[in-house]
Amino acid sequence: MAAFGLPNFGQLTEAFKKAQQIQQDAQKLQEELDAMELEGKNQDGRVSICLSGNQLPLRIEIDPSILLEGKEKAEIAILEALKDAHELSTSTMKERMQELTGGLNLNLPGIDDGD
């Protein structure tokens, strides 16, 4: 047992190694999220928006037929697709971060909270 309730040197070394591994894994995860293309669509599938795993917009595709239905209809369809893509991207990021931190109870806002 270590003096004064402090962890022994071996425990401290192990904790630092673990922290370094998490940092390396976090960097790798960041790169994986950047490379992802997650597609969201509106209800009828005529508008699709792709975001990266870090919510960066990558591209948008609009079926020309929706433009013939008027500005308001097109705006609604684009917003639906954007919301779908954003939800997919954020949930993917959250899942991957939880895998990375696996049971460490870091209480990271937006990641470890109970939704």
Curated annotation (Swiss-Prot):
The keyword Cytoplasm applies. It is found in: Cytoplasm, Nucleoid. One of its GO terms (molecular function) is DNA binding. Transmembrane segments: none annotated. SUPFAM superfamilies: YbaB-like. Keywords: Cytoplasm, DNA-binding. InterPro entries: YbaB-like_sf, YbaB/EbfC. Coiled coil: none annotated. The keyword Cytoplasm applies. GO terms for cellular component: bacterial nucleoid; cytosol. Binds to DNA and alters its conformation. May be involved in regulation of gene expression, nucleoid organization and DNA protection. Belongs to the YbaB/EbfC family. Homodimer. This is Nucleoid-associated protein P9211_00201. It comes from Prochlorococcus marinus (strain MIT 9211). The lineage of its organism: Bacteria, Bacillati, Cyanobacteriota, Cyanophyceae, Synechococcales.
